[in-house]
Design a protein with these regions (language model features):
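Hydrophobic cores of alpha-helical transmembrane segments in multi-pass inner/ER membrane proteins
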Residues: 17-27, 52-57, 83-94, 144-155
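Transmembrane alpha-helix entry/boundary detector in multi-pass membrane proteins
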Residues: 42-48, 68-85, 105-113, 136-141
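C-terminal ends of transmembrane helices
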Residues: 28-38, 92-103, 154-162
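Juxtamembrane boundary at the C-terminal end of a transmembrane helix
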Residues: 181-192
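N-terminal topogenic module of multi-pass integral membrane proteins
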Residues: 1-78
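Interfacial loop-to-transmembrane junctions
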Residues: 156-178
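Small-residue-rich segments of transmembrane alpha-helices in multi-pass membrane proteins
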Residues: 49-52, 111-123, 171-183
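Short alpha-helical packing/oligomerization segments
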Residues: 7-10, 121-157
Length: 192
């Protein structure tokens, strides 16, 4: 598919699509496991959560392979800087959300920051490989920031919402991430 760019871009593309699928599995799990006023069997919730985790692990694996195997034709931002920014960002958000706003810390904060870091590294890789232009890269950096800010807002207000509003609030970040990943895959496909 990406013969001009080698197998690295094809692997990265598969990882991006798999992360969109992971978001879809997570949506199904959330919809079943947290549906208000209905209890589902624990085994069903478990199967859906395992499917979500499997998709996520495959996605990160393929994306990491594509990132580290990609041939660079121009300078990008060092991956270490993006990772360090993610660690610092996570600690700051953890302190602000928990100590300042007294919001219980959950896995979702880690997932939001982790997705942002991974997505920014992917955008940087696509730029450095020559597949994304300055404009493409800027667009996806802005899109990543919008999704992160909106997801953090949903994260912060979740426990203050009544059942049905909280249920819907939990869907929003997953939908946004899925759309962002599909948009990135589309632009990659068009630029190949």
């Amino acid at each position: 598919m990406f013969s001009n760019y080698g197998t690295a871009m094809g692997t990265l593309f598969k990882g991006i699509l798999m992360l969109a699928a992971c978001s879809g599995c997570y949506l199904v799990w959330w919809g079943v496991a947290f549906y208000p006023e209905r209890h589902v069997p624990l085994w069903l919730s478990g199967i859906l959560l395992v499917a979500t985790a499997a998709c996520g692990i495959m996605a990160v694996n393929w994306m990491a392979q594509g990132i580290f195997q990609a041939e660079k034709v121009r300078a990008g931002i060092p991956v270490g800087w993006i990772l360090a920014g993610g660690v610092i960002g996570y600690v700051v958000l953890l302190v602000i959300s928990n100590i300042v706003f007294h919001r219980m810390v959950t896995t979702e904060l880690f997932l939001i920051v982790g997705w942002a870091v991974l997505n920014l590294i992917v955008v940087d890789t696509l730029y450095a490989s020559g597949l994304f232009s300055d404009g493409d890269s800027s667009l996806f950096v802005v899109l990543t920031l919008i999704v992160v800010v909106a997801s953090l807002y949903c994260y912060m207000i979740y426990y203050d919402l009544e059942k049905w509003k909280g249920y819907i609030d939990g869907f929003l970040p997953l939908v946004m991430v899925g759309i962002a990943m599909l948009a990135m895959a589309r632009v990659m496909f068009l630029r190949k």
